[in-house]
Amino acid sequence: ISEDTSSDKVSTYIVRSESKDKLQTLYRLLCTFESGQTIVFCNHRESVDRVGEYLRSQKLAHEAYHGGMDQEVRERALYKFRNGSSNILVSTDLAARGLDIPEVQHIIHYHLPGSEDAYIHRTGRTARWNAEGSSYLILHAEEHTPEYLEAEIEDYVLPERAGRPQPPMWSTLYIGRGKKDKINKVDIAGFLYKKGGLTRDDVGTIDVHDYYAYVAVRRDKVRQLLILIGNEKIKGMKTKIEVAK
């Protein structure tokens, strides 16, 4: 295997699935992660959608990401993943390169990557900037470890029972005003502090676009915040403020 994927910072495991349908195995694996951001890689858009639907049925917060989605939907998914509103991103190899996604601790290969190059780019999403990370290959009985993974890989044995992952600390709010309305990050932060009663620790990253903005707010503060700012104006303008879908 190339030195790009043999870094001591990445621990690689095989997770055995009793059936070709790996959804339950994936869910059990995700439930063993106490913290950290996770990317689940699938080989097809349809698989991303199917995995996403299953996780939704299990009420597991996640975002889906693939080339068949509108650009705005993809941008929102990445923003929510980056700001900690979602700890799980289910994606095709579109997320394997060229995206600024820091601090990913877990990579799950729901499907085996089609090539060594694809594996390298997927695994390269974790253990960046001197952090440590883990890579998991979910294999059913008829699948074998790829030849380019020469070293013997440890099996990751799933517990019979595991708790559910903690919900994300943050929630993303949509604000229906942006740069074209002369709204900037300072305006949004000030509005949330003054009208919403939030502190600096309650507000995460703010992303302002031309006609709208996103802001991360501590999840346990959102309900009261929306009540407080329901009829308030930002810089004298009425605007829609809601939890981003």
How would you label these PLM feature ranges?
Residues K59-L60, S86, L198:
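Short phosphate-binding/catalytic loops that engage adenosine nucleotides
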Residues L55-R56, F81, L192:
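Hydrophobic alpha-helical packing residues
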Residues V40, L78-R97:
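Conserved two-lobed SF2 helicase motor
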Residues E75-L78, T92, Y119-T123, D202, ...:
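Short beta-alpha junctions and helix-cap segments that line functional grooves
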Residues I88, R97-L112, S134-I138:
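A short beta-strand element within the Helicase C-terminal
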Residues I1-V73, Y110, I138-A151:
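Interdomain coupling/hinge region of P-loop NTPase helicase/AAA+ cores
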